[in-house]
Amino acid sequence: DLCAYFDCPLLLGRVQGLLEDGEDLVQAKEWIKDCVRQVARHAGETGVPIAYEPINRFEMNYNHTTKEMVAYIQEINAPLSHKVGLLMDVYHMAMEDNSIAAAFVRSIPYIVHVHFRDSNNGVPGSGTIDFADAVKVLDAMEYKGWIALEVAFDFCDYEKGARDSMAYLAPMIAAAQQCR
């Protein structure tokens, strides 16, 4: 209901849980599917988009790649009229997907929300992730949703982080738009 009030998507990340050794993955995935379906039904009544985030293998123990998460989302969505989509986080994609650009292209119909965070948990341009391909693909697909800058709390002050991020990303955005 808060998402409807603020006109923003509901973001699901770690909601899938971290399984302990010996826990039944198949059963856990069924429970999570049931929970997400219940949330999706309510979100459908309020018009709230849902974005489910694949998380890297160091933080979660299943649904790491965008390909795995798309398959899981397809299972979740099968009986639903209000569909669940993807939250694409380049930080996790850089660890789990062979190509960030290919993962974006493969997932276009499902993308609801995007996170830009560099490999060191800092602002784009402070680590090793090349954001240029992501910017090009998002521009080519005419993505109109939010791109959130996700930065670790202790990395920098937020105003400086926002300025540094835009200084780094603005030339890529301009170059991508010139290629249209």
Where are these predicted regions, by residue range?
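Histidine-acidic metal/acid-base catalytic patches
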Residues: 37, 63-88, 92-180
